[in-house]
Amino acid sequence: MVNETGESQKAAKGTPVSGKVWKAEKTPLRAKSRVVKNKKLTSWELKKQKRLEDKQFKERLKALKDEKEEARQAKITMLKERREKKEENERYERLAAKMHAKKVERMRRREKRNKALKER
């Protein structure tokens, strides 16, 4: 803008470039300012909320079931291991009755070594 003296002057903030100061200044539209507080939910929002609650409930149930199943499987594996150890000890006792103790001990060590190699 150029004033009467011929000097160029920078437009003040808030005034339009055209210089038409009689027009109202507009503020930018902000969606958050238009939200109505305490409004009732629409049927779609209710359905969405119910769906979310159902999903969370099912996830909790699934987590509980998984935890229960893990405990059950741990118990089963523990029982299997115990039975295997017991069976192995009984077998060694039967062998010890037939053979010399040192020979049985050597056999036991050899079998453990073979088992360790096999598991690699």
Curated annotation (Swiss-Prot):
Induction: In response to cytotoxic stress but not genotoxic stress. Residues 81-96 have a biased composition (Basic and acidic residues). GO terms for biological process: ribosome biogenesis; rRNA processing. Keywords: Coiled coil, Nucleus, Ribosome biogenesis, rRNA processing. GO terms for cellular component: nucleolus; nucleus; preribosome, large subunit precursor. It is found in: Nucleus, Nucleolus. Signal peptide: none annotated. Residues 97-113 have a biased composition (Basic residues). The keyword Transmembrane helix does not apply. Pfam families: Cgr1 (PF03879). The keyword Cell cycle does not apply. Residues 1-26, 81-120 are annotated as: Disordered. InterPro entries: Cgr1-like (IPR005579). Residues 47-106 form a coiled coil. Belongs to the CGR1 family. Involved in nucleolar integrity and required for processing of the pre-rRNA for the 60S ribosome subunit. Present with 2340 molecules/cell in log phase SD medium. This is rRNA-processing protein CGR1.
